[in-house]
Amino acid sequence: PGDSVETRINNALAQRTGAELYQEIVTTVPDGTAQTMIAARSNGNAYIKMDMGDAGSLVYILKDGQGYLVDDASKMAVRGEVPTVSTSEIVSADEGEAQEIPCTVTTVNVNGQDCEALSYTATDANGQTATVSYCLVGDDLKYVVTDAAEGRTIVEYRVTSTTVDQNLFNIPADYQILTQAEFEAAQANH
């Protein structure tokens, strides 16, 4: 009580950007398929692991300002340019956009739980509108829900730990580290 929903959401976002944390981000699309992304952050380093289904998993490590795309199957890491988006944007893709858009405080039922939420309407390039809701459970930003014509997409944030194993940010010693150009050349030879 006391703080508005908007203030509490902004506080939750600020905490997430600065904190050391290990979280699972689970995205459930309208057909019920769920995809899990692991995101960890500590000391300015970031680790992101995305489950790509049959293609295995994709790991991205940002360490000491250098980005690496790690492929466990081939034991290779491709050293790339660090994308211009900041780490916090990667981990919380659309979260900053709610600021300038008229928002409504609502209650959204997510997975059978009523959550206080801040909702706004977004229009995509094709003119389709969707309602995006930032949902709090207590003071924690737990879900970002998008309700669109094709159904509901739920992104759930599960912070599993506030301490991060620093080994996550290390590329295993037996992995080959290549530049993007070297990697492309190696692919061309196969």
Predicted ranges, named:
Residues 1-45, 107, 167-190:
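N-terminal leader/targeting segments and the immediate start of mature chains
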Residues 24-28, 49-51, 63, 106, ...:
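A structural detector for beta-sheet-dominated domains
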Residues 25-33, 45-54, 89-99, 121-128:
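Short, solvent-exposed secondary-structure boundary motifs
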